[in-house]
């Protein structure tokens, strides 16, 4: 079952925690690639100095953040790595959740090819498939073409995992500071990174 529009509404920190354990799905050339979300970061612009929308900054890149919740915000870092975010909060409130890491589930062969251009990989390479925001976008084939796409679409969405299959019973949710935001002054210390403690696909312990 796809997460309905209402799933993305409400407090961004709560939406971030609700995303843990759900499945991010991208259909590429008719083939399903997916992974269970195991690590996220919340960004609460315009008061959050780590957010692209801090101070109400509104640009062509950030415009989607000001729109309806439940849309994809994709951007590039270092000119080469894509990052995938879920827009949250009401229209006009530019907030979102960065998906930092996944446990790969569907389309494993396609994911391996996307990451390493081969299907025979080592155990270390397997653990490295989707344990970071740029890695998971490469693995799932998410690019700037997906910016602004509704997460109600057939090709890009979040699937709600049934309670009996949900991994939340196996892992404790831990909160801590977000990663690589040294520029963000006091916001550096906000405990808005949420992840499953001990999960092998978390990007940073």
From Swiss-Prot:
Q: Does the keyword Electron transport apply?
A: no
Alphabetical keyword list: DNA damage, DNA repair, Hydrolase
Q: What class of enzyme is it?
A: hydrolase
The SS bond pairs are: none
Give the range the annotation lists for the signal sequence: none
Q: Which InterPro entries match?
A: Formyl_transferase-like_C_sf, MPG, MPG_sf
Q: Which superkingdom heads the taxonomic lineage of this protein's source?
A: Bacteria
**Name under which the protein is recorded:** Putative 3-methyladenine DNA glycosylase
Organism equals: Bacillus cereus (strain ATCC 14579 / DSM 31 / CCUG 7414 / JCM 2152 / NBRC 15305 / NCIMB 9373 / NCTC 2599 / NRRL B-3711)
């Amino acid at each position: 079952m796809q997460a309905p529009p209402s799933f993305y509404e409400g407090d961004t920190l709560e939406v971030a925690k609700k995303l843990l354990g759900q499945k991010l799905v991208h259909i590429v050339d008719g083939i399903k690639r997916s992974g269970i979300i195991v690590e996220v970061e919340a960004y609460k612009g315009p008061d959050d100095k780590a957010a692209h929308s801090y101070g109400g900054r509104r640009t062509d890149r950030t415009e989607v953040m000001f729109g309806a919740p439940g849309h994809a915000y994709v951007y590039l870092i270092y000119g080469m790595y894509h990052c995938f975010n879920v827009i949250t909060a009401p229209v006009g409130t530019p907030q979102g959740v960065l998906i930092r890491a996944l446990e790969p589930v569907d389309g494993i062969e396609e994911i391996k090819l996307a990451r390493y251009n081969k299907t025979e990989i080592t155990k270390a390479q397997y653990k490295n498939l989707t344990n970071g925001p740029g890695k998971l976008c490469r693995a799932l084939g998410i690019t700037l073409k997906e910016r602004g796409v509704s997460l109600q679409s057939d090709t890009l969405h979040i699937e709600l995992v049934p309670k009996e299959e949900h991994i939340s019973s196996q892992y404790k949710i831990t909160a801590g500071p977000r990663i690589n935001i040294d520029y963000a002054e006091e916001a550096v210390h906000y405990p808005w990174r949420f992840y499953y403690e001990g999960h092998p696909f978390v990007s940073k312990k």
